[in-house]
Amino acid sequence: MNEIISAAVLLILIMDPLGNLPIFMSVLKHTEPKRRRAIMVRELLIALLVMLVFLFAGEKILAFLSLRAETVSISGGIILFLIAIKMIFPSASGNSSGLPAGEEPFIVPLAIPLVAGPTILATLMLLSHQYPNQMGHLVIALLLAWGGTFVILLQSSLFLRLLGEKGVNALERLMGLILVMMATQMFLDGIRMWMKG
């Protein structure tokens, strides 16, 4: 039980639902509330499916594509960096996701890389490699972490009402700065792994 809880805490910290709130709100701010909820449920379910696939078959997928784990880290860092720059310096039209106003996101950037990002996918591969006989526990931990993320992100409209548009914009820029640092670290970790390999 302790292993499940510790793994779930680790996974939810990596998923970072509170950090992702401003990005989700920004990407979906031109969408009607009912449609926004449906999109979020769809994107979160896609993210869960991707995470489960990587938990069970991540190493095999990378081997099949002749990709190394550091490739996931480097490419993920680049994508997150570009998203972060758009958060800090939003264009006059559209939003920080790079989508035109009113256009619906599909898979990128919400499901991947924000919820099911390179860090969580690499962590799931690592956990499945370290604990091959405890896959049931790992699945439960993943479902708990995903469930917590699901609940927090579905309450984004509540945060929007509490913070207001200016508050969300300020939070978005702050998270953009943090995301730049996280993306840079992810990129550097990938480079470090590549140089060691």
From Swiss-Prot:
InterPro entries: Multi_antbiot-R_MarC. Signal peptide: none annotated. It comes from Escherichia coli (strain K12). Keywords: Cell inner membrane, Cell membrane, Membrane, Transmembrane, Transmembrane helix. The chain crosses the membrane at residues 4-24, 45-65, 72-92, 106-126, 139-159, 174-194. It is found in: Cell inner membrane. The keyword Iron-sulfur does not apply. It is a multi-pass membrane protein. GO terms for cellular component: plasma membrane. Residues 1-3, 66-71, 127-138, 195-197 are periplasmic. Residues 25-44, 93-105, 160-173 are cytoplasmic. It comes from the Bacteria. Belongs to the UPF0056 (MarC) family. Its main location: membrane. This is UPF0056 inner membrane protein YhgN.
